[in-house]
């Protein structure tokens, strides 16, 4: 039975921004962190999924998962199309990655996070679980400074010119994959530096938005489409540019995309096409990385480090929390 909510939707979203959405990623991060270094990617991911779904269902929203753990026949929970929340309050789209960097968590390596985005209903890109070409830079540049179809070398030179520096002062973040060898060669041919990461391209894209602190000016490469939408939600909140294209290189992938509303398989998506309305983004560290500190387990306290953002205000909050009611994390 639906519960009447008297709070105006705009105020309700603000409340979610400050508290509820943070609790969702905190719970997922703590559950995954209990399995750091255990070498079991599936167990860590499942623990995060279970915790995130449980918390989502406590929120006063009518939520639909549009970016999740897979399509209905591939994932038992948080699948694309699943309804979450209390069936009360605003209708929202939900994008989740309960554990980005499953390998990082399993090996207790830096940079694993629990992350999600929430947007006005019908405004997030419904992307199939395929690969996506991506390029991203931070705020402060004219639109079109970099382009997805330009070469990596050209994009470095164009960004360097816009920034007023030599190409050797530019650093490009790239996932360390064999498929990116040409990108790496092209970037280095200009004198620019490449920073390689093993996993975690949501956090990788976010790094571009704050080059003064992260040392990263641009992200280039091919990664998961779901992660691309989550990263776009973050940039929608904090500023920046991003261009993406789904890689639909088989009939089966094109058909899956068509069923999800993709009419042009060659379309280049900007942030505004992937996130068309007000959105919230939150991420909590699982293992300590350059973006967030990992979960810390003390004798009587659990510490979490979270960033939460909202597009309509441009507000970014960092929340370092100490949790003393520990049983709230371990409800199996």
Task: Give names to the regions the model predicted.
Residues 84-85, 114-117, 215-219:
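Short basic, glycine-rich beta-strand/loop surfaces that mediate nucleic-acid
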Residues 119-147:
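Flexible glycine-/small-residue-enriched beta->alpha junction loops
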Residues 150-310:
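An extended, acidic
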Residues 16, 136-154, 169:
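Glycine-rich phosphate-binding "P-loop"
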Residues 15-18, 39, 103, 142-144, ...:
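A short glycine/serine-rich beta->alpha loop
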Residues 2-95, 157, 161, 188, ...:
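N-terminal subdomain of lithium-sensitive/metallo-dependent phosphomonoesterases centered on the IMPase/IPPase/PAP
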Residues 89-100, 104-125:
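DPxDG-like acidic metal-binding loop motif
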């Amino acid at each position: 039975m639906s519960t009447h909510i008297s709070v105006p939707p705009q105020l309700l979203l603000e409340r979610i921004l400050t508290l509820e959405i943070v609790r969702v990623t905190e719970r997922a991060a703590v559950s995954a962190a209990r399995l750091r270094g255990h070498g079991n990617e599936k167990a860590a991911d499942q623990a995060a999924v279970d915790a995130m779904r449980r918390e989502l269902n406590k929120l006063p929203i009518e939520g639909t998962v549009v970016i999740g753990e897979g399509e209905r026949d591939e994932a038992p929970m948080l699948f694309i199309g699943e309804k979450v929340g209390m069936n009360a309050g605003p209708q929202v789209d939900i994008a989740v990655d309960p554990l980005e960097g499953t390998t990082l968590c399993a090996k207790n390596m830096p940079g694993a996070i629990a992350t999600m985005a929430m947007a006005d209903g019908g405004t997030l890109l419904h992307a199939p679980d395929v690969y996506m070409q991506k390029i991203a830079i931070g705020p402060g540049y004219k639109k079109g400074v970099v382009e997805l179809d330009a070469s990596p070398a050209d994009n470095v030179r164009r960004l360097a010119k816009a920034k007023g520096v030599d190409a050797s002062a530019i650093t490009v973040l790239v996932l360390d994959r064999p498929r990116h060898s040409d990108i790496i060669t092209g970037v280095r041919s200009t004198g620019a530096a490449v920073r390689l990461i093993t996993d975690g391209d949501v956090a990788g894209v976010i790094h571009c938005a704050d080059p003064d602190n992260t040392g990263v000016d641009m992200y280039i490469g091919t990664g998961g489409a779901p992660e691309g939408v989550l990263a776009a939600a973050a940039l929608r909140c904090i500023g920046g540019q991003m261009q993406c294209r789904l890689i639909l290189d088989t009939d089966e992938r094109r058909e899956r995309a068509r069923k999800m509303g993709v009419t042009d398989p060659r379309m280049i998506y900007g942030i505004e096409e992937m996130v068309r309305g007000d959105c919230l983004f939150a991420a909590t560290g699982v293992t300590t990385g350059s973006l967030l500190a990992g979960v810390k387990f003390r004798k009587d306290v659990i510490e979490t480090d979270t960033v939460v953002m909202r597009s309509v205000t441009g507000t970014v909050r960092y929340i370092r929390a100490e949790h003393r009611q520990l049983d709230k994390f371990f409800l199996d």
